[in-house]
Curated annotation (Swiss-Prot):
GO terms for molecular function: semaphorin receptor binding; signaling receptor binding. Pfam families: ig, Sema. One of its GO terms (biological process) is negative regulation of axon extension. Residues 32-519 form the Sema domain. Coiled coil: none annotated. It comes from the Eukaryota. Its main location: secreted. This is Semaphorin-3G. Disulfide bonds join 105-116, 134-143, 270-382, 294-342, 522-540, 603-655. It comes from Mus musculus (Mouse). Residues 569-671 form the Ig-like C2-type domain.
Amino acid sequence: MDPSAWAICCLLGSLLFHVGIPSPGPSPSVPRLRLSYRDLLSTNRSAIFLGPRGSLDLQVMYLDEYRDRLFLGSRDALYSLRLDQAWPDPREVLWLPQPGQKVECVRKGKDPLTECANFVRVLQPHNRTHLLACGTGAFQPICTFITVGHRGEHVLRLDASSVENGRGRCPHEPSRPFASTFVGGELYTGLTADFLGREAMIFRSGGPRPALRSDSDQSLLHEPRFVMAARIPDNSDRDDDKVYFFFSETVPSPDGGPGHVTISRVGRVCVNDAGGQRVLVNKWSTFLKARLVCSVPGPGGAETHFDQLEDVFLLWPKAGKSLEVYALFSTVSAVFQGFAVCVYHMVDIWEVFNGPFAHRDGPQHQWGPYGGKVPFPRPGVCPSKMTAQPGRPFGSTKDYPDEVLQFVRDHPLMFQPVRPRRGRPVLVKTHLAQRLRQIVVDRVEAEDGTYDVIFLGTDSGSVLKVIALQGGGLTEPEEVVLEELQVFKVPTPITEMEISVKRQTLYVGSPLGVARLQLHQCETYGSACAECCLARDPYCAWDGTACARYRPSSGKRRFRRQDIRHGNPAVQCLGQGQSQNKAASGLMTRVFGTEHNSTFLECLPKSPQAAVRWFLQRPGDKGTDQVKTDERVVQTAQGLLFRRLSRHDAGNYTCTTLEHGFSQTVVRFALEVIAAVQLDSLFLRESRLEEPSAWGSLASASPKTWYKDILQLTGFANLPRVDEYCERVWCRGVGERSGSFRGKGKQAKGKSWAGLELGKKMKSRVLAEHNRTPREVEAT
């Protein structure tokens, strides 16, 4: 059967199924480019490692750029992957629970598949040849050292004889949130250290000094959910270094009311903390915490708070600048689901910790600033050169007076909260189909400034690439979603993300596996200057011939075209290879439609962020008018749908897009409307000349309502009937008669009744009817 004839017969059904929903206006939060799992693989932008058994059960990921290795901790195994290759030679070491641990775990009521295994949750660098690894050990945590060799060697070995108890260094459960970092040969962890998951603490172990832990007082930690831990120096004095913990707490209502609320915190301890001599023995004597606020200001002073901390990324600066903390938050409200990204300067965090302490007289009282005398040395400070005074040396926290230790025990909370830069989030996402789980940031130098590119991992296996424009007269940050990348084939939550600026690569981890993803692929945006400029990707610029990687030190400076802030190709791309686009926009596709029938004109812009507009030039008119839509003429996301075509709809249609003030033509159609009377006459004449048959009598019984029959037949359950109806009544006959679907009026995608040159074919068809081959007999 002629493909054009089949497309004509089944067009109406596909229209009803696929284009019946009106198109909403473009949203600034819609990704400008969406790339599927297949797209990423076919363009070599990503590579996937699923392990030898098809699924990793990944728990932790450690990127070691010194050794050019990526280390993975999973269920009962560890892996080493080389960064300079597409995972061709992975190394695996099995690490099963100790004998009897799994049996005991099952006996205690835990799940043998999802809990009673050794889930590796800690991978930290110990020295130049070894990593410290800790696993859940079937609810009996264990730790050991892993030999990884020197730089250039691809070695991965586990010494089973060195396995030791990991309690306090690794949680019992594979799903329990926790954070860890390795500083000076010691492991700092924030976790719940008991079997039942109730004993929350911050723990230090593994070095020559005695282990240190949080006091059991509930005022320190209330059901914490640890997210991240890192050593952050306050100044050049190494004795003043601190380890910062980022976490959320569920605490009693701060105003003394009933119920509990979730609050995000930043806490810190001194690296040289040794505990107290008589008070807080073997306990933290420098622990302080402050609230992290991420909220959107509203009318009347009301604020919408994002209180659940999801992930934290530290953006280390160049010399002379302050460290910036990017934090991803979510709402805890049952009313709506929202996410926000707030940015904090470390200098602002330091100011809060140097400010007033919080105090209240009782559980039913509100918090206020402490107004009494603060002892010396100031509670929470590290013993260092800054605290030493003549005649009163404090070389260790054990030398601190008891009143200092008692004060820090009673007042661990700071009164002032830490507020984000500019007082509001740089990015807010609400009513998403997926949850945001991970965040990493890359600071990129572009032609018109420096931009922070934010990569957000979701719980559906995709990564959003976003920039937030600030300043330049903007009262609020402008969100620009550059790409949505479907990294994994099936939906799976992204639980780990690491970025290599040196390799311009993002490493994405999920329970399914690990993906290596290039940060950019500029040629994907298109082959024209306007398309490259409209992408607004700081990584990419038009170099005069193609959309290519922007390099600040490139010698082709005068040829580069890039406008991240405004995305205006009208200025940037003047005379830069737009002739090809103009030639394409001048092409006119001829489309035929039948009066009172449905017809569809397809227009698919490259950018979902562009506003689509349709213009009509009627026969005899010199100017064009914008198409007015109503119940009969509907503009959808795929094009323009005429539900019931009229003779007045004939004319030249132009589909244009408008994006950042730049308009361009996508496609043009010349729509010709065939009168219903003319088509009815054709069917009536054919039915009289045909041999009698059941299908022939059906066609001639109601020649004026044939299109209504097709509409009634459309539907998934009736597709075989549509096929048979088209085949026997119309499609095969038309395909065999005089090549009436051949010629210059060819069927375009989604166009009905293309190629019916009725005026030219009518006479020849009538003269040749007596020589026509019967429909049910093949020609010889």
